[in-house]
Amino acid sequence: MTEFCAPKGVPDYVPPDSAQFVAVRDGLLTAARRAGYGHIELPIFEDTALFARGVGESTDVVSKEMYTFADRGDRSVTLRPEGTAGVVRAVIEHGLDRGALPVKLCYAGPFFRYERPQAGRYRQLQQVGVEAIGVDDPALDAEVIAIADAGFRSLGLDGFRLEVTSLGDETCRPQYRELLQEFLFGLDLDDDTRRRAALNPLRVLDDKRPEVRAMTAEAPVLLDHLSDVAKQHFDTVLAHLDALRVPYVINPRMVRGLDYYTKTTFEFVHDGLGAQSGIGGGGRYDGLMKQLGGQDLSGIGFGLGVDRTMLALRAEGKSVGESARCDVFGVPLSEQAKLTLAVLAGQLRASGVRVDLAYGDRGLKGAMRAADRSGARVALVAGDRDIEAGTVGVKDLGTGEQVSVSTDSVVDDVISKLGR
């Protein structure tokens, strides 16, 4: 066993899995960029208070899962557990909300939560996110949802479903809160769950314990108590999804794990992942900007799990991503040949050809075995005699045929053989 290993719940991605990781991440981002979303890079850690206030102190994320520590200046900082609060902070700090609205941003990277590691649920999780801030328009909600749907489908994933609901607005939420608390306080709940019911009763509906889920099965449903404005908003979102041909199912009992969600809320699930079936989700957060010290502007966004999407693709027997295999493998048999082939490799790479070289003193047989293992279609073979003659051996690794080609013509000859 090696002396050092990755921390528990923190995965490495090495070839060939890393190629799929990059393809999934970039595929999900591309769907957002095509809709006019600009890229934003966020700090890995932020002021702890940002997440406590933005995500919600009653959530499991803040109360149980954050990586929080004091830096050398005795400031409390936290490794980011999610992206929305950081994006909203950046929008306010840089005055992006003073320009054209909505502000459309996308991002990708690692996020950190102290959870029990299992398949698809890591302590360092990789996500792609989208945020649209500044416009309260159900058509924008539908666009954001459609971007996520298009991102998954662009990867060839099709065994997922979209679940949607509405968490209401400032008019109906307080009334529903009282109704839900009255129901919950009539149950035989443990002290910790009763505390959460008093602080934020929706958190109890998000409890994953079977005994709690059984007790709350008959809880009142927020969809049945929407205000006229919230109902109209939700109906319009659904109409737009229908027009965009984005299939969905309404899940009236969906509760997201973050406190800032209002109105439209959604989740993408894939049954091939077992209990941890979510591959992404999001919703509208109309009060978060003001809560974090900015203008009273609405927003909507999502976070899609790169790790979980990879598992979903695997469950469907699908793979994406360009492998690290090369097109051409150089076999230098002398120091001078090594220099010549390095120059040719640079010229071929500049033309978009993937080239690798044999390094070290492998000898011809060892180098050719490496060429075969590389997956290359063509090998360039040269020794001192070839260099003196101004030629390089170009070998088709499929047929075994080898011809001598003048050094000046090697690049064009190889590109022709590869059908480029």
Curated annotation (Swiss-Prot):
Reaction(s) catalysed (UniProt annotation): tRNA(His) + L-histidine + ATP = L-histidyl-tRNA(His) + AMP + diphosphate + H(+)
EC number(s) reported in the record: 6.1.1.21
Gene3D superfamilies per record: Anticodon-binding domain, Bira Bifunctional Protein, Domain 2
GO biological process entries: histidyl-tRNA aminoacylation
Keyword entries, A-Z: Aminoacyl-tRNA synthetase, ATP-binding, Cytoplasm, Ligase, Nucleotide-binding, Protein biosynthesis
One GO MF term: histidine-tRNA ligase activity
Subcellular location field: Cytoplasm
One GO cellular component, as annotated: cytoplasm
Homology family: Belongs to the class-II aminoacyl-tRNA synthetase family.
PANTHER family: HISTIDINE--TRNA LIGASE, MITOCHONDRIAL-RELATED, HISTIDYL-TRNA SYNTHETASE
Oligomer status and interactors: Homodimer.
Record protein name field: Histidine--tRNA ligase
Organism from which the protein derives: Mycobacterium marinum (strain ATCC BAA-535 / M)
UniProt lineage: Bacteria, Bacillati, Actinomycetota, Actinomycetes, Mycobacteriales
